């Protein structure tokens, strides 16, 4: 077994030998060649006013200071309570990788690495950046599927990534035991960097461009002023800031509490081990690539002539620093470590010795056990915080070194230009809310840490901490009948099962046990009538004398007449799609706005911010948790609901997109004639406590019509056939509404100068480079999920955005962005799925006409086109 060395050098972190920089004067990083700056001292200078105050001197905070100052922002101040890198940065293993299983974070990783590659030349500071590449190991067939899945999601990105055979792996990592290795995922350019040196280089660059980095300068108080500025108090004095950015690492919770916020963060212990010199490693002619054994759940890299490896224990064995959760971080904690606990990671040590046998010859010369901070879903929180003006966060970084460079650039661009440079909704701090309790956060953080290296399936569900307090009124009635999905704290039915059907959660890269039940739900909606729980929708009430002016400023569509609803989009100043909502004009000057569950606070923050900036006299209320929503859809929907209300629901009286207040089974509801299925349907908004009674009444009334339930998976198949776009997939901050095919909802000729109007006019005048198209393809047992590569003539030319099996034509269906010249109906392309390219053809959309369109055609004597 691995022999413990003569001593465990706690607190001593062995660094790799730094690479030597080139002599000579570094080029300017300020964008102002030849302009000399006087030397700045972090200890002696002070400012009374600042444009931006960054709280926290770890790698992320210093990166933001660097990027803001480099971009030309004056009066950038960073306040650090002890010294730069104190906290989690100084003891990090320093891994860098282009890989990320998600889509948007690949851009963050890319920007980080590209910055780190040039930072030494720019600043004259050595950063110790090694780029030997990295290999992820597949030792099971399902891992090979996962790698194929990730390959197709990388083809349309700038990142280099290759699926390599065992022979190539052996050549690149000759010390590996190849008995179980089936394949590898190889990223050239991956590696590791010295976190301390990296931070000091960023600090040098920030100072050179005029930023003030002040330490030790602990923030003791934060006070918001009525004009949106902040008073920042420290022992050295106070400072007025136009905005503050919380980048305080594991101190972020304490900073948040100063202004009444409870950030969902949990400090966890993470260990890695450094070995003595290993002769076989020392004899190598080149540095080993970083190794990630996913089944063993550890990373391993070369550290001088030895090895460094760090495991991720299971959620049962991992260690949360509970005392910090309860009592806060000890005031003096900065560059300390925890006691090592090798017993906790022994199974991973054994796995590493089996995979890399030379480890058996080594001594342990160092065990590093330090704190890192986890959010519930392991992703950081980056951006402005809803409900608190000019308060931004960059917190919760479990992988701060690889995120720091890219996040600093991303956040700097957002602060300077008023909108995010690209879509990164998964990092939005407003994805959490009051439902995110400490108990939930700890349960999810444990799960996320323990699941670091599990297989990443599409449609993945994780079950720790569920359900939250946010369950709909129907949860107990439906939970035994369906597979629930988690949406912003809510439980929502994904698919329903019948007696005798497989009810287990069985994730797969191929069609799995929900495929047939979802097909039945699809037919139920298309042929009869079905009910779905839509309670997770975000719901806002807006009223006041300026409500119409505010909404006309926010939305690209016109404001609907009283008693009607429309689909409207909020755009960014550059004309990108920030959000999609339904807007119902309930009474003169009073509106009900509906958005998706995942964008509730994301959208609310934008609306509130614009209302304050413009000085609009409005009242905005978030009523998401007050209202339940039932969707009733299908050709028999009118017949069923008519039994329960005295209101005339006929087509001529209750028109498409009309909204009315009425009673259903004597229960007050706001009924909107709309359905994301594209079929005849209503959304029924009601008091949350009435959900069970309303549901029971509808189900009882629909017995003769064969009423049943349906979930979100069937909804997705239905909306794709109707060519309905989904926010976050077909449209987001990476797309404009013209290329997304949303022209109908954009009124460039309306009098109001809505946000993004002028930019959109310019986009239209210049012409589009790509378009969203709908395509069909015949596959084996796999369907598009979104973000797969589109091929044409041997090259990747675009990407899917979402997909499903079409139960009407029994083929796969997908939306995709392709170049304009390849966007014509009938154009043939290929879609890559699990390592195979399938022929696909662009079709005239929609595949299936919506119920209102079919009605209009029938009235004109046309045919019911499908």
Swiss-Prot record:
InterPro entries: FAD-dep_OxRdtase (IPR006076), FAD/NAD-bd_sf (IPR036188), FAO_M (IPR032503), GCST_C (IPR013977), GCV_T_N (IPR006222), GcvT/YgfZ/DmdA (IPR028896), GcvT/YgfZ_C (IPR029043), TrmE/GcvT_dom1 (IPR027266). Pathway: Amine and polyamine degradation; betaine degradation; sarcosine from betaine: step 2/2. The keyword Cytoplasm does not apply. It comes from the Eukaryota. It is linked to DMGDH deficiency: Disorder characterized by fish odor, muscle fatigue with increased serum creatine kinase. Biochemically it is characterized by an increase of N,N-dimethylglycine (DMG) in serum and urine. Catalyzes the demethylation of N,N-dimethylglycine to sarcosine. Also has activity with sarcosine in vitro. This is Dimethylglycine dehydrogenase, mitochondrial.
């Amino acid at each position: 077994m691995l022999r413990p060395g003569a001593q465990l050098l706690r607190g001593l972190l062995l660094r790799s030998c730094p690479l030597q920089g080139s002599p000579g004067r570094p080029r300017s990083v300020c964008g102002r060649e030849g302009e000399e700056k006087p030397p700045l001292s972090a200890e002696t200078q002070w400012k009374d006013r600042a444009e931006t105050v960054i709280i926290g001197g770890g790698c992320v905070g210093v990166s933001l200071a660097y990027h803001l100052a480099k971009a030309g922002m004056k009066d950038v101040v960073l306040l650090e309570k002890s010294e730069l890198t104190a906290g989690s940065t100084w003891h990090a293993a320093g891994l860098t990788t282009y890989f990320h299983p998600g889509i948007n974070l690949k851009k963050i990783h890319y920007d980080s690495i590209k910055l780190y590659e040039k930072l030494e030349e720019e600043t004259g500071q050595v950063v110790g950046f090694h780029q030997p590449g990295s290999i992820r190991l597949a030792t099971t067939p399902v891992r090979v599927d996962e790698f194929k899945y990730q390959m197709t999601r990388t083809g349309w990105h700038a990142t280099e990534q290759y699926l390599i055979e065992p022979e190539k792996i052996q050549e690149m990592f000759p010390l590996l035991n190849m008995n179980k290795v089936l394949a590898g995922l190889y990223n050239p350019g991956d590696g590791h960097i010295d976190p301390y040196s990296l931070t000091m280089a960023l600090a040098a660059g920030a100072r050179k461009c005029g930023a003030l980095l002040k330490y030790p300068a602990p923030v003791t108080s934060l006070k918001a002023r009525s004009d949106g500025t902040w008073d920042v108090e420290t022992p050295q004095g106070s400072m007025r800031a136009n905005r503050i950015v919380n980048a305080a690492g594991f101190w972020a919770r304490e900073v948040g509490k100063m202004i009444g916020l409870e950030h969902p963060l949990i400090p966890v212990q993470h260990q890695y081990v450094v070995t003595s010199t290993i002769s076989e490693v020392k004899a190598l002619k080149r540095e080993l690539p970083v190794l990630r054994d996913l089944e063993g759940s550890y990373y391993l890299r070369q550290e001088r002539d030895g090895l460094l490896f760090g495991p991720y224990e299971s959620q049962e064995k991992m260690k949360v620093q509970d005392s910090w959760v309860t009592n806060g971080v000890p005031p003096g904690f900065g560059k300390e470590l925890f006691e090592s606990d090798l017993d906790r990671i022994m199974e991973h040590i054994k796995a590493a010795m089996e995979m890399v046998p030379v480890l058996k010859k080594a001594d342990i010369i160092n065990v590093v056990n330090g704190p890192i901070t986890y959010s519930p879903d392991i992703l950081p929180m980056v951006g402005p915080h809803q409900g608190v003006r000019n308060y931004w966060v960059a917190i919760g970084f479990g992988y701060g070194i690889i995120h720091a460079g890219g996040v600093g650039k991303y956040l700097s661009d957002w602060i300077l230009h008023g909108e995010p440079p690209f879509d990164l909704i998964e990092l939005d701090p407003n994805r959490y809310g009051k439902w995110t309790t400490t108990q939930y956060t700890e349960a999810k953080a444990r799960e996320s840490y323990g699941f670091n290296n599990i297989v990443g399936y599409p449609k993945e569900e994780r079950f720790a901490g569920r359900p939250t307090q946010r369950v709909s009124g129907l949860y107990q009635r439906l939970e035994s009948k369906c597979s629930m999905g988690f949406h912003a704290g809510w439980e929502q039915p994904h698919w329903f099962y019948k007696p005798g059907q497989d009810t287990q959660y069985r994730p797969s890269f191929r069609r799995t046990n929900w495929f047939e039940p979802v097909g039945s739900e699809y037919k139920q909606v298309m042929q009869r009538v079905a009910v779905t729980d839509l309670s997770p929708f975000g719901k806002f009430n807006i009223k006041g004398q300026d409500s119409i002016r505010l909404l006309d400023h926010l939305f690209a569509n016109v404001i609907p007449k009283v008693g009607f609803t429309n689909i409207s989009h909020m755009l960014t100043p550059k004309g990108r799609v920030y959000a999609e909502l339904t807007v119902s004009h309930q009474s003169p000057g009073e509106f009900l706005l509906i958005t998706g569950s995942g964008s509730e606070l994301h959208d609310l923050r934008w609306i509130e911010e614009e209302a304050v900036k413009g000085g609009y006299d409005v009242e905005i209320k978030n009523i998401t948790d007050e209202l339940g929503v039932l969707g009733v859809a299908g050709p028999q929907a009118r017949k069923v609901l008519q039994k329960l209300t005295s209101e005339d629901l006929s087509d001529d009286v209750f028109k498409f997109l009309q909204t009315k207040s009425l009673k259903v089974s004597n229960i007050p509801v706001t009924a909107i004639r709309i359905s994301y299925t594209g079929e005849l349907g209503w959304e029924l908004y009601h008091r949350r406590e009435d959900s069970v009674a309303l549901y029971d009444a509808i189900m009882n009334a629909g017995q003769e019509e064969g009423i049943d339930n349906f979930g979100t998976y069937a909804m997705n198949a239905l909306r794709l056939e109707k060519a309905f776009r989904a926010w976050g997939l077909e449209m987001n901050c990476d797309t404009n509404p013209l290329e997304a095919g949303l022209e109908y909802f954009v009124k460039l000729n309306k009098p109001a100068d809505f946000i993004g109007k002028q930019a959109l006019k310019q986009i239209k005048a210049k012409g589009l480079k790509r378009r969203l198209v709908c395509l069909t393809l015949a596959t084996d047992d796999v369907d598009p999920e979104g973000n797969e590569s589109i091929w044409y003539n041997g090259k990747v030319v675009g990407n899917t955005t979402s997909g499903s099996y079409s139960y009407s034509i029994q083929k796969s269906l997908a939306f995709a962005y392709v170049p304009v010249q390849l966007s014509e109906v009938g154009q043939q392309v290929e879609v890559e799925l699990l390592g195979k390219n399938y022929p696909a053809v662009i079709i005239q959309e929609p595949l299936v006409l919506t119920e209102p369109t079919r009605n209009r055609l029938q009235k004109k004597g046309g045919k019911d086109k499908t």
